[in-house]
Amino acid sequence: YMWRINKALPRRGNIGIFNRSHYEDVVVTRVHDLIENDKIPKDLVNKNIWKTRYRQIRDWERYLAENGFHIIKIFLHVSKDEQRDRLAERILNKKKNWKFSIADINERRFWDRYQDLYSEMIEETSTEKAPWYIVPADNKWFTRYVVSQIVLKAMKDIAPKFPEMSKEIKEQLEEFKKLIESGNIGMIEEMQDVMKGGNK
């Protein structure tokens, strides 16, 4: 269940955003008893499978952190009443009809089960290197503000910098600068000589 997430990891220096990700496999899969349909050895489907998956997730996220990944996990918590109002708005407001899905209505029947599993998931997988941030999400402006502050702090902690240029590249840039300032930027041959390290 982790392979699809693992292969979608961002390259070093890039940022990746996962919507739900591997955490579906310890929540949705349990709500709807989908584990029996997974193509995994049957002897692995036992009473310890969820504890095992929690451990695997913690181990995987620790591995990522130890290899330079900065992990931010945000849980947007919408109340049951607010969810009801938003679903009603999607039905009543023509401009929001495109957001409507009957699946969202059906899932509300499992609200309590979801809340129990979300709580367990957060407790089992929130760690020092990969903590969960639980953000109240009834008020969208407040949610966006809190999330932006979480991301901003993380970016400040990471303190990203532009790649360092080699001495050779810096020298080539100076030559290009001279070409531009002298009005000779169109002289392709001369620019090619500069790239080769020449200086005619």
PLM regions with names:
Residues 1-8, 26-30, 56-60, 83-86, ...:
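Alpha-helical scaffold elements adjacent to nucleotide-binding pockets in ATP/GTP-utilizing enzyme cores
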Residues 7, 20-29, 33, 96-98, ...:
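Flexible, active-site-adjacent loop/turn segments at secondary-structure boundaries
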Residues 114-200:
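NTP-dependent small-molecule kinase module
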